């Protein structure tokens, strides 16, 4: 795996562009299990960043619906979803290599075959490697809320990002978000509701109950015990 988690963007003259990122690089130490997974499973399930669009049928060895998860953390819920839906293909993107290693190790342990992972900036991957009109679902679960007002601009859910996601979804594809930070949930709802071409799947035009397809994380279980809320939003591409 290349150590290029964060790559610069360049303009037509080759000058680097400065872009506000929604994450902070926190690599941390790899456990032996994570390192083993990166050394041995990455060559099979890992996807290196490059400037060529992905051919999903070739990547997965079959033509099947594709779900993209952005920022999968340690990968437990992503692996669980891939295992629960073997008829679908899953691609996960995470910028922190310990999480990628943990996800790969879990996938091997669970015998999951329909999962591929990347260790790179998801926005660059979307721009460069994900073909337009190719995804059945995009998942963004518990992104950094950047709760301080001066940091709100770092939140990944902004109109340009949501428009980018829409361009990658097939007609009828769904952008599924979840957050445990109420102010961010309100922000997500405002952003998504302001855009043409999306339809809120909520009957009340705000939030949806957690679908069974999204596993409850350990962090989320702890939050429930403490009385914390979680907000799910699902917006369908309609044009």
Curated annotation (Swiss-Prot):
Classification via InterPro entries: SAM-dependent_MTases_sf, tRNA_(Gua-N-7)_MeTrfase_Trmb, tRNA_methyltr_TrmB_bact
Residues at which S-adenosyl-L-methionine binds: 69, 94, 121, 144
UniProt KW keywords: Methyltransferase, S-adenosyl-L-methionine, Transferase, tRNA processing
One Pfam family in the UniProt entry: Methyltransf_4
GO cellular component: tRNA methyltransferase complex
Pathway noted in the entry: tRNA modification; N(7)-methylguanine-tRNA biosynthesis
Region (Interaction with RNA): 150-155
The enzyme's E.C. designation: 2.1.1.33
Family membership: Belongs to the class I-like SAM-binding methyltransferase superfamily. TrmB family.
Protein name: tRNA (guanine-N(7)-)-methyltransferase
Organism: Klebsiella pneumoniae subsp. pneumoniae (strain ATCC 700721 / MGH 78578)
């Amino acid at each position: 795996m290349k150590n290029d988690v964060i790559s610069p963007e360049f303009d037509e003259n080759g000058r680097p562009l400065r872009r506000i990122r929604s994450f902070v690089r926190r690599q941390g130490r790899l456990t032996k299990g994570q390192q083993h997974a990166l050394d041995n499973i990455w060559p099979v399930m890992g996807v290196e960043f490059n400037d060529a669009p992905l051919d999903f049928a070739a990547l997965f060895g079959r033509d099947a619906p594709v779900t993209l998860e952005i920022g999968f953390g340690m990968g437990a819920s992503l692996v669980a979803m891939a295992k629960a839906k073997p008829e679908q293909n899953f691609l996960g993107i995470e910028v922190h290599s310990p999480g990628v290693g943990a996800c790969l190790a879990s996938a091997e342990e669970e015998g999951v075959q329909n999962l591929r992972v990347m260790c790179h900036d998801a926005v660059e991957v979307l721009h460069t490697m994900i073909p337009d009109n190719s995804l059945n679902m995009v998942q963004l679960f518990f992104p950094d809320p950047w709760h301080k007002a001066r940091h709100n601009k770092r939140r990944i859910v902004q109109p340009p990002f949501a428009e980018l996601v829409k361009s990658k979804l097939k007609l009828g594809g769904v952008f599924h978000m979840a957050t445990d930070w109420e102010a961010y949930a309100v922000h997500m709802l405002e952003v998504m509701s302001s855009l043409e071409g999306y339809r809120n799947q909520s009957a009340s035009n705000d939030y949806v109950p957690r679908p069974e397809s999204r596993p409850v994380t350990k962090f989320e279980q702890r939050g429930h015990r403490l009385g914390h809320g979680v907000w799910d939003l699902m917006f369908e591409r309609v044009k």
